């Protein structure tokens, strides 16, 4: 199931983590349409924006993320992701169990959710993980 047993926040925005059996449905309803609803509540409706979000949720998401399109026979298998992983939520630190002078990469301020395993990559690229991070971590 895609979702999470508790509300988490992405920044200061609560996330609707209600469970869905389909990644496409979770993404369309609990990310795109949920954020549209929050925007309309705060700023009033925007007919053009609403139309674009709904069209994306109804037409684009099923084509790109729909069941049977990704993940082969198994489909998309939900994995726990951080949910808000960007350079401001990552650093180098020392955990209490570590010896003096030791440090390691740490991440914090999660917006955890069971999601598509590649969801995090889009967020990371959009908000500030640069090539140098990948060279140091994956290279």
Sequence positions of predicted segments:
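Active-site Asp-x-Gly
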Residues: 19-28, 35-37, 74-80, 87-139
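GST-like fold's C-terminal all-alpha helical module
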Residues: 61-66, 70-71, 77
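Active-site catalytic-loop/activation-segment of kinase and kinase-like phosphoryl-transfer enzymes
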Residues: 6-65
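Compositionally biased, intrinsically disordered low-complexity regions
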Residues: 5, 13, 70, 90-95
